[in-house]
Swiss-Prot record:
Keyword Transferase: no
Protein's name in the database: Disintegrin and metalloproteinase domain-containing protein 10
Parts of the chain that traverse the membrane: 674-697
Phosphothreonine carried by residues: T720
Upper classification of the organism: Eukaryota, Metazoa, Chordata, Craniata, Vertebrata
Region Interaction with AP2A1, AP2A2 and AP2M1, annotated ranges: 735-749
Co-factor: note: Binds 1 zinc ion per subunit.
Alphabetical list of SMART domains matching this protein: DISIN
Organism: Rattus norvegicus (Rat)
Gene: Adam10
Length: 749
């Protein structure tokens, strides 16, 4: 009995030692453990991965033990968060910055795990998602100052984040009165004529245009960001690398949330940083720095960001380390599909205060009531504020606020991202959008994403195309009919992978059966074309092998061209050692020949003639070959229509055609001929016009005033309203009455 008691006491003491005796880091984090792995070794691994040429050296491995488990991180440089034109601006310098210290990976051997962070001076900072929740790693000196510690970093679990009760009236977001003032201001934007007309035209097209947009913009799913940090943010984190690591961590966090959300058929919404502006401590006194003042309210801080022109970006945010009133952690303009300005892709325009502003903006602070909030809190805040930009107001109603429900089952799942007050972040719904938010956001995305969203250039699991890093891709769970492949709704490490024991997937290519096996060598996988033979499966791959080309100079494209090396690329003239030319009317050719394929002898333009001419009868046997509709004709001065007529293109445009129509001599000749032929009709029209004018003068003359006093006065027009002067009251002298009778009369009134 004594031994178990001793063991329990030892385990309790060890647990307290690992968690720094159970002491919280600050009022937000109630439990942590220290990390003391070899920073020199990790720094060397980082330098090796940075210079890596071989595939294996590109991976960064980090192993450590914490919170009663082993972490074996396998990470690789993350380039998906920064655009090809990524720039870092600091103190009037623009740099092509190296982001090789940003990593993304997973825990080796743990399915569905995910990690993201940075390696600066041999220390990893970031977050690790596991089956048991998310862990956060930060430098120890960020929380524990002026002490010698046996560890250099701290790690804590998301469940150990303590959200204080006093979190502002709106839980980190501004109250309703602020949003109401912002909404009224957004309504005062003056739309530029061209953009307003294009938006009205798009709206008039209705659902048909939206369907076309959804098809053509399937890959335009990336919102490019411009992020600035003020001098207070830089002062807290200390270095440029640490600041960029924080930005990367925030963008990756919201990227994970938005990519996994289906916005009414719009999927894989992602984010990419295009430009970063870092205001260092030296910029605190710079008169050109709008954020240099220490005491700025949250609304004014957002306004300073909005006064800059952000037309080149989807969204523009400023990160700061300020303690705003009422515990506000973020503020952003709410987007709308139409009717008001603000949100994603909004362009700079003039507003009621006479200033031009960009309302595709927001702000985030990492300080709340004198303490710095954990990354988990600011990540959720960032996702919440971007949700406003995307068009979602705060959640309301029983459907979208289950945390307020009296049903314990619904209440246990918590509220969604766009809930007005603070969420703990550890409930099932805290990292998801409600149906209300999804409906609002999808409407804004349908209307606005074509204005500024770009193609990500990154592999997308769920788009039906097998790309780098994917074994297969059968789409999402509602689309995937494939028994061989895990759909895109599966967790990381599992989605777009072959199921165990399956040889292939039909999504890989046509040489895989629905039973997940390769087709035999004799099965056809591609029909023959003008210039290539049919494709035949090889029996050991799902891809259809390249087809053998047909012989060169085989006729193709309706006998107007010939095959060259398997491609329909040569002119039919080349088959007979001739060159193709253009029959032009200036050559005296018949207009009917302008849409014929014409050939000439090499280096002899004077021999240019139609394939149906006697000149080339020997080669083409009198067969006339016509150009395809839409082909240029008459020496590129027109195009062939479906009737093989050469339609000339008027380079002067519609105004010139209108001028020609009005002032054409032929027009006046035709009018003169008609008058001669129908002189009687012209005479009748002249008489009718004279009678009409006479009647008009006669009718109106009786109502017209005259200066001749002998004429009767004009008659008023029927229906004319006359203003009657009210009768003047007759003034009577007041009569003297006894006081009593006056009072009684006054009471009777």
């Amino acid at each position: 009995m004594v031994l178990p008691t001793v063991l329990i006491l030892l385990l309790s003491w060890a647990a307290g030692l690992g968690g720094q005796y159970g002491n919280p880091l600050n009022k937000y984090i109630r439990h942590y453990e220290g990390l003391s792995y070899n920073v020199d070794s990790l720094h060397q691994k980082h330098q090796r991965a940075k210079r890596a040429v071989s595939h294996e050296d590109q991976f960064l491995l980090l192993d450590f033990h914490a919170h009663g488990r082993q972490f074996n991180l396998r990470m690789k440089r993350d380039t998906s968060l920064f655009s090809d034109e990524f720039k870092v601006e600091t103190s009037n310098k623009v740099l092509d910055y190296d982001t090789s210290h940003i990593y993304t990976g997973h825990i080796y051997g743990e399915e569905g795990s995910f990690s993201h962070g940075s390696v600066v001076d041999g220390r990893f900072e970031g977050f690790i998602q596991t089956r048991g929740g998310t862990f956060y790693i930060e430098p120890a000196e960020r929380y524990i100052k002026d002490r010698i510690l046996p560890f250099h970093s701290v790690i804590y679990h998301e469940d150990d984040i303590n959200y204080p009760h006093k979190y502002g009236p709106q839980g980190g977001c501004a109250d309703h009165s602020v949003f109401e003032r912002m909404r009224k201001y957004q309504m005062t934007g003056v739309e530029e004529g061209t953009r307003a007309h294009s938006e009205e035209h798009a709206a008039s097209m209705g659902p048909e245009l939206l369907r076309k947009k959804r098809t053509t913009l399937a890959e335009r799913n990336t919102c490019q960001l411009y992020i600035q940090t003020d001098h207070l943010f830089f002062k807290y984190y200390g270095t440029r690398e640490a600041v960029i690591a924080q930005i990367s961590s925030h963008v990756k966090a919201i990227d994970t949330i938005y990519q996994t959300t289906d916005f009414s058929g719009i999927r894989n919404i992602s984010f990419m940083v295009k430009r970063i502006r870092i205001n260092t401590t030296s910029d605190e006194k710079d008169p050109t720095n709008p954020f240099r003042f220490p005491n700025i309210g949250v609304e004014k801080f957002l306004e300073l960001n909005s006064e800059q022109n952000h037309d080149d970006y989807c969204l523009a945010y400023v990160f700061t380390d300020r303690d705003f009133d009422d515990g506000v952690l973020g503020l952003a303009w709410v987007g709308a599909p139409s009717g008001s300005s603000g949100g994603i892709c909004e362009k700079s325009k003039l507003y009621s205060d006479g200033k031009k502003k960009s309302l595709n903006t927001g702000i985030i602070t990492v300080q709340n009531y004198g303490s710095h909030v954990p990354p988990k809190v600011s990540h959720i805040t960032f996702a919440h504020e971007v949700g406003h930009n995307f068009g979602s107001p705060h959640d309301s109603g029983t459907e979208c606020t289950p945390g307020e429900s009296k049903n314990l089952g619904q209440k246990e799942n918590g509220n969604y991202i766009m809930y007005a007050r603070a969420t703990s972040g550890d409930k099932l719904n805290n990292n998801k959008f409600s149906l209300c938010s999804i409906r609002n956001i999808s409407q804004v995305l349908e209307k606005k994403r074509n204005n500024c969203f770009v193609e990500s250039g990154q592999p997308i699991c769920g788009n039906g195309m097998v790309e780098q890093g994917e074994e297969c891709d059968c789409g999402y769970s509602d689309q995937c009919k494939d028994e061989c492949c895990f759909d895109a709704n599966q967790p990381e490490g599992k989605k777009c992978k072959l199921k165990p024991g399956k040889q292939c997937s039909p999504s890989q290519g046509p040489c895989c059966t629905a039973q997940c096996a390769f087709k035999s060598k004799s099965e056809k996988c591609r029909d023959d074309s003008d210039c290539a033979k049919e494709g035949i499966c090889n029996g050991f791959t799902a891809l259809c092998p390249a087809s053998d080309p047909k012989p060169n100079f085989t006729d193709c494209n309706r006998h107007t061209q010939v095959c060259i090396n398997g491609q329909c690329a040569g002119s039919i003239c080349e088959k007979y050692d001739l060159e193709e030319c253009t029959c032009a009317s200036s050559d005296g050719k018949d207009d009917k020949e302008l849409c014929h394929v014409c050939c000439m002898k090499k280096m002899a333009p004077s021999t240019c003639a139609s394939t149906g001419s006697l000149q080339w009868n020997k080669q083409f046997n009198g067969r006339t070959i016509t150009l395809q509709p839409g082909s240029p004709c008459n020496d590129f001065r027109g195009y062939c229509d479906v009737f093989m007529r050469c339609r000339l293109v008027d380079a002067d445009g519609p105004l010139a055609r209108l001028k020609k129509a009005i002032f054409s001599p032929q027009l006046y000749e035709n009018i003169a001929e008609w008058i001669v032929a129908h002189w009687w009709a012209v005479l009748l029209m002249g008489i009718a016009l004279i009678m009409l004018m006479a009647g008009f003068i006669k009718i109106c003359s009786v109502h017209t005033p005259s200066s001749n006093p002998k004429l009767p006065p004009p008659k008023p027009l029927p229906g004319t309203l006359k203003r009657r002067r009210p009768p003047q009251p007759i003034q009577q002298p007041p009569r003297q009455r006894p006081r009593e009778s006056y009072q009684m009369g006054h009471m009777r009134r």
